[in-house]
Every structure is written in structure tokens, then in C-alpha cells.
Amino acid sequence: MKMMIAVFVSILLLMFSLSSTAMGMETEQQNMEERADMDFTGIAESIIKKIKETNAKPPARFDPATFGENED
């Protein structure tokens, strides 16, 4: 009986974790869509182009190998 309760609780926790992750991903998707739909009236085209290029790039990652190469 104790084993069944433990399994049931584990399944509930797993379901909660997955639903929380899905909700977080949905919120992030909505934020990305809102950023894409910004109103750029009155802003120079060159600035708009730079903003869109920046938003299209993936986030930067730290790579320690690049520091090792430049220490000559």
C-alpha cells in the first residue's frame, strides 16, 4: 500500500513539473511574439533593421576555449 502511494505521488509530481515547464515555454513564446509585433513608427529604418537582426540572433554563450587561444 505504501508503495502505491509513493508511485501515485511521484506521478502527480511529474505531471505538475511537466505542466509547469509547458506553461513557462508558452509564456516565453508569447513574449517572443510580442517583441516581433512591436510598433516601430517614427523610428529610423536602420535602427529597426539592427533591432530585428539582434532579436533574430541566438543568445550568446560563454566559451572558455576562446580565452585559451588568445593568451599567446
UniProtKB/Swiss-Prot annotation:
Q: What is this protein called?
A: Hypotensin
Give the pH dependence.
Shows stability to pH variations.
* Subcellular location(s) of the protein: Secreted
Gene Ontology cellular-component terms listed: extracellular region
Per the record, the GO terms for biological process are: defense response to bacterium; defense response to fungus; killing of cells of another organism; regulation of blood pressure
Signal peptide limits: 1-24
Q: Which domain of life is it from?
A: Eukaryota
Temperature-related activity data read: Partially and reversibly loses its structure as temperature increases.
According to its UniProt record, in which tissues is this protein expressed? Answer: Expressed by the venom gland.
Q: Which UniProt keywords apply?
A: Antibiotic, Antimicrobial, Bradykinin receptor impairing toxin, Fungicide, G-protein coupled receptor impairing toxin, Hypotensive agent, Phosphoprotein, Secreted, Signal, Toxin
Species this chain originates from: Tityus stigmurus (Brazilian scorpion)
| Classification of source organism | Eukaryota, Metazoa, Ecdysozoa, Arthropoda, Chelicerata
